[in-house]
């Protein structure tokens, strides 16, 4: 099983690896080490290995060159700018201490103001340091302007992209997004050494790694079955890098290697239909929802579940809205903060992946400006087997995501986590989620980014939460929204691709398997 991240924080991948191992498959999950050293641990009966990966190809050649013509005084893009900036800061800090020491010595000696050669020398150095700081700052600004002019989004870059796409077709990714080779060079040799019977490639980057391993194995007379697990509709993704080549490069890479997949799985029916049409797949991808693992027993089942209300300093009756997941502008979290002045007495808990990120700090600052900072609570993730019980302490689950193509076509992880916590929902009007909430009656829908409509929806839910919670009593609703149900779909895909696999002595799913995992994992992306 292949994934392009550090595994921790990716609940879908963790659940897939663990449930496949519980079903009797011999699972090795390869991820990317966040530091330069390899790491390994057990995830239930699955083995996790994190591989160190260098990224020299993620930087383009122009990023190593100086802009001699446009910005001749800019620092070279070698990292020396940060070194010089820090050096000047250290120098000025030292001068401040020397000034304080001379001032104290003069006062203790009864001389009043300091003087003499040491003081004159210090004053001269301070002037020199000030001039140096301005010079370093100027060269830094020149470097920033040079980089801004090299973001690969100008007319020349669009022409370059069009040229290679016309010349090489889907093979153009080798020119447009060469950083994909960094993944191949790190993961490929490890996959070859493992000699798997089946590769489960998560998302678009790992599709190429898996396909190339399959091609090499076929040349040696071995068959590898390849499963592509598509988490997103790539043409609708907001580019992860700030250049015009990233998206067409990755789309071309995906198109080149999709034909090598023996089966495709994905996260929603809408995305399954899109993928079948986009890639002319012979069959509709199997749908494996991002549902929570409600029956999973942790390695330490006695570990206490944090109390979300206690962490917020709230009693049992205070209205508490919760958002759990990634903190980013396209997730629409600003609407929660803007609404707080219009929701007297209500509190908001943001359970996010990076509580101290610049985006989250901006939300806190805005809450302070609105004089509602005491009602905004920022909390870190909890282990994924505690998520549902943790969230159940809130009163309303909020999903305020904005209109992006991938948001329209799937029920995201937090939707299912809120549902199993039996929380009434307030969700934005992205298509699939809004249709589901209206059909089940488990919450209210508001217009994305519309603060007034959000306040209306929250007010309606808080007025009669029992009405919305009653939706979860529908027979079979929550049972279908579990990872245990989804794992059976995945197991059927594996079994179909490997019909000659020996009988699998399944590990009982209810039994905790030895697990040694670094501290915390995601609440839900």
Q: Predicted regions: what is each one?
A:
Residues 449, 463-496:
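A charged, aromatic-enriched C-terminal amphipathic alpha-helix characteristic of glycosyltransferases
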Residues 375, 391-408, 423:
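Acidic donor-binding loop of glycosyltransferase active sites
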Residues 28-31, 49-52, 225-226, 235, ...:
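Donor nucleotide-sugar binding/catalytic pocket of nucleotide-sugar-dependent glycosyltransferases
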Residues 315-318, 352, 360-386:
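Nucleotide-activated donor-binding/catalytic signature segment of Leloir-type glycosyltransferases, i.e.
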Residues 27-178, 270-276, 285:
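N-terminal strand-loop element at the rim of the active site
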């Amino acid at each position: 099983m292949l994934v392009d991240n550090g595994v921790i924080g990716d609940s879908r991948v963790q659940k897939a690896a663990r449930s496949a191992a519980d079903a009797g498959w011999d699972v090795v999950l390869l991820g990317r080490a966040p530091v330069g050293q390899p790491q390994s641990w057990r995830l239930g009966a699955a083995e996790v290995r994190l591989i160190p990966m260098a990224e020299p190809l993620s930087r383009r050649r122009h990023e190593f060159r100086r802009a001699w013509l446009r910005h001749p005084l800019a620092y070279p893009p070698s990292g020396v700018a940060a070194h010089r900036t820090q050096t000047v800061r250290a120098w000025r800090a030292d001068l401040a201490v020397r000034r304080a020491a001379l001032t104290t010595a003069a006062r203790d000696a009864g001389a009043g103001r300091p003087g003499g050669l040491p003081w004159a020398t210090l004053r001269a150095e301070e002037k020199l340091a000030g001039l140096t700081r301005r010079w370093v700052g100027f060269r830094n600004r020149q470097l920033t302007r040079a980089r801004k002019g090299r973001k690969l989004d100008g007319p020349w870059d669009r022409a370059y992209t069009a040229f290679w796409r016309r010349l090489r077709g889907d093979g153009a990714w080798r020119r447009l997004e060469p950083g994909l080779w960094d993944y191949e060079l790190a993961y490929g040799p490890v996959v070859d050494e493992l000699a798997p019977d089946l590769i489960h490639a998560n998302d678009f980057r790992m599709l190429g790694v898996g396909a190339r391993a399959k091609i090499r194995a076929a040349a040696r007379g071995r068959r590898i079955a390849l499963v592509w697990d598509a988490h997103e509709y790539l043409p609708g993704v907001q580019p992860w890098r700030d250049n015009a080549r990233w998206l067409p490069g990755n789309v071309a890479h995906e198109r080149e290697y999709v034909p090598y997949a023996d089966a495709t799985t994905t996260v929603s029916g809408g995305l399954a239909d899109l993928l079948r049409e986009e890639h002319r797949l012979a069959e509709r991808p199997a749908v494996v929802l991002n549902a929570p693992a409600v029956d999973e027993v942790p390695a330490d089942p006695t570990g206490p579940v944090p109390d979300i209300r206690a962490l917020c300093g709230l009693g049992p009756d205070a209205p508490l809205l919760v958002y759990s997941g990634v903190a980013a502008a396209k997730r629409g979290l600003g609407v929660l903060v803007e609404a707080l002045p219009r929701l007297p007495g209500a509190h908001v808990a943001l359970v996010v992946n990076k509580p101290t990120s610049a985006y989250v700090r901006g939300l806190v600052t805005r809450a302070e400006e609105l004089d509602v900072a005491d009602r905004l609570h920022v909390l870190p993730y909890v282990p994924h087997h505690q998520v549902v019980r943790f969230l159940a302490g809130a009163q309303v689950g909020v999903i305020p995501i904005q209109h992006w193509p991938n948001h329209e076509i799937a029920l995201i992880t937090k939707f299912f986590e809120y549902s199993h916590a039996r929380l009434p929902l307030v969700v934005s009007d992205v298509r699939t989620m809004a249709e589901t909430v209206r059909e089940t009656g488990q919450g209210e829908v508001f217009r994305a980014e519309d603060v007034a409509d959000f306040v209306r929806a929250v007010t309606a839910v808080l007025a009669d939460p029992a009405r919305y919670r009653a939706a979860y009593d529908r027979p079979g609703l929550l049972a279908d929204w579990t990872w245990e149900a989804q794992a059976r779909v995945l197991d059927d895909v594996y079994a179909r691709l490997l019909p000659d696999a020996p009988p699998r002595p399944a590990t009982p799913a209810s039994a905790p398997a030895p697990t040694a995992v670094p501290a915390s994992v995601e609440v839900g992306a």
